[in-house]
Amino acid sequence: DYSANNKWMNELHLNMNADINDKTKFYGRLSMAKNWSQMGWSGTPYDLDAGRNTRSSGPVLYVDRAYLDYYITPEWIATVGRQPGTDGPGSNLRNNALRQSTYPALAINALGDAAVITYKPESLQDHKVAIRAAYGKTYQWDEEGKVRDWMSDQKDADANLYYAAVEGELPIEGMGDNLIIFNVAHMTDFALPLPGINLPIGPSGALVNVLQDGVYNLGNLTLANIHFENYNAFGTNFNYFVSLGYSNGTNAHTLSAIPAVQSQLEFNEKDGYAVHVGGRYDFTKTLKVGYEFFWGSRYWYTMSRPSINDPLNIRMTRGTAHDFYVIYQLDRYQFLRLSYTNIQNIWGNRGLPFGGAKKDKARADNIMLMYNVKF
């Protein structure tokens, strides 16, 4: 057991947008998240860009999102670039914000680059229907960080991400603003950087390298999600969301001939399930109180990473999580949020898609005060 108290952090978002012409629009965001007077930053980005831990980027700006929307017709839109893949539906209530991302947070809550085609049928715009298909990369070989490495030899395949979604508004009279999303993501050749492993072999106990440093393909991953949210439900001051998740690993790769090593690195070819629900009641325009509950099964895994708003990465829980928060709106541009989060993990290796999930008992508690300014 341990505790870490009196920790202070800053996060900065520099948002950009430009109407290039009637058909082309640009959106971007540069971000930084750092501890006060942070020490220990290495000066290099993580090997896997999509897995960047934005709790703390160090005192540097990084590209959070940068993409172009091109309106082929009023109904067909092409999008290319670094996607708005963080703080999506499912995080709006707690973040006291409007929709910040295309993708539900329980399915995709990470940095990533993709090409997307969106179809918004004019006949269904009263119900805000949008149909999307996307292709992206979550790992692409680049040994030295130079463009010429696109053409170099590589050991394992690039990881490819395919995504499809249908979203719209339920036509229920009096319900209020609502959003329902059905979406599925499939990743082939899921890749992660792994450290080298040396083990004593033979009577002499000499250390032998049984796994070299590098990026390895682990297997294929499928995620499915249904998300629903409702604001000012039926004319009240109550807002809520329900998000259901499913994950499944297949085609596990053999990484080592040593059984003891392979068992620790084996991709989980198992089904995983998750439920995330939350509600917030706005007593006044100034005072808002909310609660969220999360449950993740033994082998649950999704594309989520920690953030300054969620340092414990609640969506990776293998067990149960409870979050209570109070928002005090100072004025139109700024608010305070006091929150308490409790996570009870009953299965190990949370946040990892490999290595199994043995019975565990790990508790985490976090009390945090956030001051947020938007202008």
Where are the language model's segments positioned?
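Residues that flank catalytic or metal-binding motifs in active/ligand-binding sites
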Residues: N10, D64, L111-D113, N160-Y162, ...
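Beta-barrel outer-membrane channel/assembly domains of diderm bacteria
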Residues: D1-T79, A110, A115, Y119-Q125, ...
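Outer-membrane beta-barrel pore domains
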Residues: R52-R55, G176-F375
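Short loop/turn segments at secondary-structure transitions that flank enzyme active sites
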Residues: K34, P74, P84-T86, S123, ...
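Secondary-structure boundary elements
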Residues: D22, Y71-E75, T118-V129, G168-L179, ...
